[in-house]
């Protein structure tokens, strides 16, 4: 869609869309913008065209299930919105010093996490023309004030050398403009690799990426839209962006000890990413949190198709009891008890009593206090 010059200028200066209006407010209500108290974190999502960026983003933020991503296209912009998410596609045309017109493509999304924390997600188009412009005419604009760079690699790419070249160009721009940014590399589409080869291929790719990233450090994840690995990676990324996460974890531990729970997890309400957890002993399945995220997210989607909303769930047998319930305005909580003789009502009352305290902790500028109630 063609924009006027004034619209382009505004978009380039603001570098992001307005937030969705509250319920009851008409679309496009004047004055509904990001509040001044919001703590914005700029996140770059980059990678070559076809690497799978749009599919993974649509699953995490737009409530797609994996099989529906095959039909992604023009409908993606119709689906990638909720009470927390607003998205806009910006295509800029610039004229260089010799009169050539260049175009680049960035989709901006504002995703609200935990009260005042807002992720300003820049999904950068991966076509060669766009990539070259990011490193030349728009270098400072794209790579300035970045908190996190997420670079997605297609594990089966036939242009690995070019992929690595673009990644190194990103690192050079980050080092110059945002040297404190955290770097995440997602080796994506691992489901296409033979199962007995996955560990070896990922290890080799991880070693290459760590070597190329020096002097910066990068965290590498193997991912696929078909299993819990996608949630594992994005939970780890979001965890790095939560400003008071240590305070949150300390209070979560106190809460678990007070109610004698084996495990307590906090899920972000819209995405169901794990943002914090406490466990009193090691468990056999290291990926169980992400598996739960995936299962509950799909169950929530099934509920929405029936015009119902997911609020809580209880699973109980002779060995344990597990509760998933709305916790704060931005989170769900999961409590696992190894003593199934404890009445459900007692656990649910404890969850309810802790809500107000954790609501305060979610505020970026909230009080730094500890849970001491009994």
Swiss-Prot record:
Catalytic activity: GTP + H2O = GDP + phosphate + H(+)
Regulation: The activation of GTP-binding proteins is generally mediated by a guanine exchange factor (GEF), while inactivation through hydrolysis of bound GTP is catalyzed by a GTPase activating protein (GAP). The Ragulator complex functions as a GEF and promotes the active GTP-bound form. The GATOR1 complex functions as a GAP and stimulates RRAGB GTPase activity to turn it into its inactive GDP-bound form, preventing mTORC1 recruitment and activation.
GO cellular component: cytoplasm; cytosol; Gtr1-Gtr2 GTPase complex; lysosomal membrane; lysosome; nucleus
Superkingdom classification of source: Eukaryota
Glycyl lysine isopeptide (Lys-Gly) (interchain with G-Cter in ubiquitin) cross-link site: 203, 281, 291, 305
Keywords annotated in UniProt: Acetylation, Cytoplasm, GTP-binding, Hydrolase, Isopeptide bond, Lysosome, Membrane, Nucleotide-binding, Ubl conjugation
Coiled-coil annotated residue ranges, if any: none
Any Pfam family the entry gives: Gtr1_RagA
Compartment annotation: Cytoplasm; Lysosome membrane
Compositional bias ranges of the Basic and acidic residues kind: 1-15
Enzyme Commission number(s) from the entry: 3.6.5.-
Top enzyme class: hydrolase
Residues modified as N-acetylmethionine: 1
GO MF, one example: GTPase binding
SUPFAM superfamilies tied to this protein: P-loop containing nucleoside triphosphate hydrolases
CDD domains noted in UniProt: RagA_like
Binding site for GDP: 50-55, 69, 75, 188, 191, 209, 225
Complexes and interactors: Interacts with RRAGC and RRAGD; heterodimerization stabilizes RRAG proteins. The GTP-bound form of RRAGB (in complex with the GDP-bound form of RRAGC or RRAGD) interacts with RPTOR, thereby promoting recruitment of mTORC1 to the lysosomes. Component of the lysosomal folliculin complex (LFC), composed of FLCN, FNIP1 (or FNIP2), RagA/RRAGA or RagB/RRAGB GDP-bound, RagC/RRAGC or RagD/RRAGD GTP-bound, and Ragulator.
Protein family: Belongs to the GTR/RAG GTP-binding protein family.
Function (record text): Guanine nucleotide-binding protein that plays a crucial role in the cellular response to amino acid availability through regulation of the mTORC1 signaling cascade. Forms heterodimeric Rag complexes with RagC/RRAGC or RagD/RRAGD and cycles between an inactive GDP-bound and an active GTP-bound form: RagB/RRAGB is in its active form when GTP-bound RagB/RRAGB forms a complex with GDP-bound RagC/RRAGC (or RagD/RRAGD) and in an inactive form when GDP-bound RagB/RRAGB heterodimerizes with GTP-bound RagC/RRAGC (or RagD/RRAGD).
Protein name: Ras-related GTP-binding protein B
Species assigned in the record: Homo sapiens
Lineage: Eukaryota, Metazoa, Chordata, Craniata, Vertebrata
Gene: RRAGB
